[in-house]
Amino acid sequence: MPKKDVRAFLYDILENMKDIIDFTNDMTFDEFLKDKKTQKAVIRSLEVIGEAVKNLPEDFINKYPQVPWKGMARLRDKLIHHYFGINYEIIWDIVINKVPNDIKEIEEIIKDIEGEDENSI
């Protein structure tokens, strides 16, 4: 897969992660539980992230093992198919404890890829 295509998926992932942070900014877990619109927006963004991850080539995923790619893809499957319902405590934990770090990792990967492109000119 050309780097351009990989980059498009990475930008999709990054945009949706940043959206999740924006949607839940200054929100408590109790507020999140009461706000169906935010729940649905966060769930949809997590689904899009998982779908984008599924489109990344295996060799690319293996090159960046610091990102929980497979977990993102599995979460998408669970959300899409609603296996055993949605546990909003787990979703909130992902929002608060995983997404901010994943944003940093994805930004670093994008810089890495763009640096490779500059070096190949």
From Swiss-Prot:
Lineage: Archaea, Methanobacteriati, Methanobacteriota, Methanomada group, Methanococci
Full protein name: Putative RNase MJ0127
Catalytic residues as annotated in Swiss-Prot or TrEMBL: 76, 81
Similarity comment text for this entry: Belongs to the HepT RNase toxin family.
Claim: Nuclease is one of the keywords in the record: yes
MF-aspect GO terms: nucleotide binding; RNA nuclease activity
InterPro entries, alphabetized: HepT-like, HepT_RNase_toxin
UniProt PTM comment: Modified by cognate antitoxin MJ0128; probably at least 2 successive AMPylation events occur on Tyr-83.
Secretion signal span: none
Organism whose genome encodes this protein: Methanocaldococcus jannaschii (strain ATCC 43067 / DSM 2661 / JAL-1 / JCM 10045 / NBRC 100440)
UniProt enzyme class: hydrolase
EC number(s) per entry: 3.1.-.-
Cross-referenced Pfam families: HepT-like (PF01934)
Modified sites of kind O-di-AMP-tyrosine: 83
UniProt entry keywords in alphabetical sequence: Hydrolase, Nuclease, Nucleotide-binding, Phosphoprotein, Toxin-antitoxin system
